[in-house]
Each structure stands twice: as C-alpha cells, then as structure tokens.
C-alpha cells in the first residue's frame, strides 16, 4: 500500500517547466530499448576520446620534424610533454566544468566540449613548432571537460535497468576512442608519403603532414556537436520543498536507518564520501597506467629494432590499434554487462587488472618475433590489454556514480576528472622520460632496454589491483 501511495506522490510532483522532470516522465512512459539515447552518449564520448591519443602513432615523427631533439634517443623525452599537455589542461578545469554542469546543466558543457575539439584539434594539426603543439593541446584539454558531465547524463537519461549498460557504453566509447584515435592517426598521418597518388607534397597535407588525421576527427566532432544540440537536458531546474514527493517518500520509508544515512550523506561534503574518494583514487592509478601504456605502446612500436622496438610505421601501428578497437567493441557490447552482473564491478576490476599484468609481461618477448608471428602476437596482446584495461575502468565508473546523489554527480565526476587528469598528465610525461632512458641502457644487467619500461607499467598496475581490496576500496550500498 505504501509503495502504491509513493508512486502516486511521485507522479503528481513533476514540474511542467523543468527539463529534468520531462526526462523523468519520458523514462516512465518509454517502452523498449533506448537505442537513440545510447547512440548519442556513445558518439559524444567517442568524439572527446578520439583526439586524446590520436597523436601517439605520429608524435615520434612530429617531434623529429620539429628538430628539437638533439639525438634520436631524446625524441621520447619531448614527446612526453606534448602528450601530457592535454591532460594538464583538463586537470585545471574539470572541477569547474563539473560545477557548471550541476548549476547550468549537462548539455552546455557537452556542447562546449565537442566544439572545442573542432577548433583546437584542427589547430594542433597545423602546428608549426613544439610550443604551438603544446599550447593547442593544452587548450583542447582545458575546454574539453565533458567526460564527467556525460557520465552523470548517462545515469540520468536511462531507466535503472539500463544504467549499467549506459556506463558500459561510456567506458566502451572511451576505450575505443583511445584505440581508434591512434588508428586514425596512424593511417592518415603523412598522407603525401603514404598515399602519394592521392596527396602531393605541394598540397596542404604535404606541408602539414599531420593535419589530415586531426581534420578527420574535427569533422566528426562537428557532426557530433550538431547531434548534441538536440539532446534533452536532464538536470532539474527546481528546488524540492517540504511537501514535495522527496520528503513524502522519506516519511514513507520502512527503514529509519536509511533515512539517517540519506540525511548524513546530504549534509556531508563530497570529500568526506569515502566510497567516492576511494574509487577515484583507484581510478586515478588505473588511468595513469592506461595513459602511460598508450604512449609507450606507440613509441615502442615506432622505435627501431636496435632499441628493442618493433620498427613499425604509423600505418602498421594503426592496423594493430584498429583490430584492438574492434575486439574491444565486441566484448563490451556482448560480454561485459554479464560479467558485471555476475561478479560485481569491484571483482571485474580486480580480475581485469591482474590478467593485464600477465599480458604486459609478454611484451618484451614479443619484440623478438618477426613476420606473421609478430603481427598476430602483438595484435592479440593489444586486443587483450585493451579489453582488460577498459573493463577495469568501467567497474570504477559504476562505483563512482553510485556513490553520490544526482545533484552531486557533475561535481563528483569533476573531482574525478581533475584527479584523473593530473595522473594522466603525469603518465605520458613520465612514460616519455622512462622510455627515452630505457633506450640508453640496452646493455644493463637488470631489466635492460624496454624490459624496464614494461616492468614499471606492471608495478603501477599491481598497485591499482592492491587498492581494490578492503579496507581501502569501499562500495556504497545505494
């Protein structure tokens, strides 16, 4: 009886002029699978993820063209600073964008984020020197603060039974963007050299050899911006009064202890929310590893065999990463949701991290192969690493968004984005320095060459796995 009365209260307290209430009504009346909403969330996240790592397959050659590195072994050092500038910019603005999303809505932040890709990613492709590349990447990161708000949006636009799938779509699009982005960079960079029959050296793509992949992503971002202008706003623009259904439902609760928890959570700040903070810390460790791995993989694949690399071209790297993205898409859309329901997000994260360490341990051995054996092995390892890494991140997405109320999700995701961006800014810079150092110690007695690089990656990953255990990682009961 109480449940029926609660439903009536909820039905009567929709606000006619509130965009969030309209979305809630739409969710109640909707029947069937929300294909369009899933598609829009997916392409928005993909749009913001593509430029993050699209530069890595050609960054080695871009730094070489800038003539800033005195020796070949120093290219990785300078590449790390260009790679980290995006995340450094995002670290400075993520909390601000989260607060804007909670105050003015998710949609404005999403539109600004997609539009920033159109402008600054295009300018990056036209970079004339090292500092222009750093500044345009920094600006791109500063204005691209939509990942936190889009996670909140994904929780709010879907019914409860589809929220797990929604966050899986976010992490899938994010993971695929981080993989397909480099594939685009690999296939389209230096087009006058790779496809001389289509592009001449005298064309704009010959004068700016890294402009085409940036332009392709910017065109996609422009189309996504148009689509994003049609999405509904999910943030409620009214305040609850004492006679609103929220308080009525609170009085109807059969569990007085849950009321105390709700009051306590409402009064406490986000920084005192340990389930949120602990999941953010673990998320940061995995993010640092993920970004460092993304840069190291491309540098390792591009570097000469005499330094323990694969000697791959940008197109070769693009092929490997394209297969990785396809494998990740199949797994996330077909198997991840079952694994998450069966094991829970924490166990999925823990198992994924542990298996990823095994895969990474094989990378130095892969460099000893050649021909078809090398191609098959490195592609399989890349697919496995991508699936495991994205599965771990998805579990942490779910934990973060379940740890807070709707009106706190933008700020909570902003905090997560700031912390994650700082760690991801450290990742490429540290990875570039360590990779450059490893190339100079080929004859070392302990973990020579790239063996040291992958060992350090595994140490970071092991730390993330350890932090998923109690008492450190707490799971909310909401």
Curated annotation (Swiss-Prot):
Superkingdom, taxonomy of origin: Eukaryota
Transmembrane spans: 43-63, 81-101, 108-128, 130-150, 169-189, 208-228, 280-300, 317-337, 346-367, 378-398, 415-435, 453-473
Membrane topology designation: Multi-pass membrane protein
Alphabetical UniProt keywords: Cell membrane, Membrane, Transmembrane, Transmembrane helix, Transport, Vacuole
Pfam family, one: MFS_1
Main location (coarse class): membrane
Expression across tissues: Predominantly expressed in roots and stomatal guard cells. Detected in anther stamen filaments and shoot apical meristem. In the mature portion of roots, restricted to the cortex. At the root tip, highly expressed in both the cortical and epidermal cell layers of the apical meristem and the transition zone, while absent from the quiescent center or the columella cells. Not detected in lateral root primordia.
Disruption of the gene: reported phenotype: No visible phenotype when grown under normal conditions. No visible phenotype when grown in presence of zinc. Hypersensitivity to drought stress and auxin-related defects.
Molecular-function GO terms, alphabetical: solute:potassium antiporter activity
Subcellular location: Cell membrane
Coiled coil: none
Gene Ontology, cellular component aspect: plant-type vacuole membrane; plasma membrane
Xref: InterPro entries: MFS, MFS_dom, MFS_trans_sf, Tet-R_TetA/multi-R_MdtG-like
UniProt record, GO biological process: basipetal auxin transport; gravitropism; regulation of stomatal closure; response to water deprivation; root development
Expression induction: By 2,4-D treatment.
Family affiliation: Belongs to the major facilitator superfamily.
Additional facts recorded: Heterologous expression of ZIFL1 in yeast leads to increased resistance to 2,4-dichlorophenoxyacetic acid (2,4-D), indole-3-acetic acid (IAA), aluminum and thallium. Not involved in zinc stress resistance.
Function comment: Major facilitator superfamily (MFS) transporter probably involved in 2,4-dichlorophenoxyacetic acid (2,4-D) export. K(+) may be the physiological substrate of the transporter.
Protein name, as recorded: Protein ZINC INDUCED FACILITATOR-LIKE 1
Source organism: Arabidopsis thaliana
């Amino acid at each position: 009886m109480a449940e029926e009365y609660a439903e009536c209260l909820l039905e009567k307290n929709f606000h006619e002029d509130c965009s969030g209430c309209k979305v809630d009504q739409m969710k109640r009346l909707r029947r069937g699978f929300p294909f369009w909403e899933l598609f829009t969330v997916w392409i928005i996240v993909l749009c913001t993820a593509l430029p993050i790592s699209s530069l890595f397959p050609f960054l080695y050659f871009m730094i070489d063209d800038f003539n800033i590195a005195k020796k070949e072994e120093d290219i990785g050092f300078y590449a790390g600073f260009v790679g980290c500038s995006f995340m450094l910019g995002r670290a400075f603005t993520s909390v601000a964008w989260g607060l804007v999303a909670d105050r003015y809505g998710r949609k404005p932040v999403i539109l600004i984020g997609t539009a920033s890709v159109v402008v600054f990613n295009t300018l990056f492709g036209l970079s004339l020197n090292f500092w222009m590349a750093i500044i345009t990447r920094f600006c791109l990161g500063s204005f691209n603060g939509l990942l936190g708000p889009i996670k909140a949006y994904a929780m709010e636009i879907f019914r409860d039974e589809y929220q797990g799938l929604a966050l899986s779509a976010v992490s899938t699009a994010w993971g695929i963007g981080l993989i397909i982005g480099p594939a685009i960079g690999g296939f389209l960079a230096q087009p006058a050299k790779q496809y001389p029959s289509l592009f001449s050296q005298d064309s704009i793509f010959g004068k700016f050899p890294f402009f085409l992949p940036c332009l392709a992503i910017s065109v996609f971002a422009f189309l996504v911006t148009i689509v994003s202008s049609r999405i509904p706003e999910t943030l409620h623009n009214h305040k609850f009064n004492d006679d609103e259904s929220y308080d009525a439902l609170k009085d109807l609760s059969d569990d007085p202890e849950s009321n105390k928890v709700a009051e306590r959570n409402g009064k406490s700040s986000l920084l005192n929310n340990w389930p949120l903070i602990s999941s953010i810390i673990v998320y940061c460790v995995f993010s640092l590893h993920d970004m460092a791995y993304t840069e190291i993989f491309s540098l390792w694949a591009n570097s000469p065999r005499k330094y323990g690399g694969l000697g791959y071209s940008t197109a070769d790297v693009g092929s490997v990463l394209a297969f990785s993205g396809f494998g990740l898409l199949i797994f996330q859309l077909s198997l991840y949701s079952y694994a998450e329901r069966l094991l829970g997000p924490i166990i999925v994260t823990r198992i994924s991290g542990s298996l990823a360490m095994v895969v990474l341990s094989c990378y130095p051995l892969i460099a000893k192969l050649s021909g078809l054996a090398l191609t098959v092995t490195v592609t399989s390892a890349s697919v496995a690493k991508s699936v495991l890494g994205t599965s771990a991140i998805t579990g942490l997405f779910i934990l973060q968004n379940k740890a807070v109320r709707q009106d706190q999700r933008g700020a909570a995701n902003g905090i997560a984005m700031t912390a994650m961006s700082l760690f991801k800014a450290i990742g490429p810079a540290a990875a570039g320095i360590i990779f450059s150092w490893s190339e100079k110690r080929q004859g070392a007695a302990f973990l020579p060459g790239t063996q040291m690089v992958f060992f350090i990656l595994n140490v970071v990953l092991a730390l993330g796995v350890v932090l998923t255990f109690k008492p450190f990682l707490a799971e909310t009961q909401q």
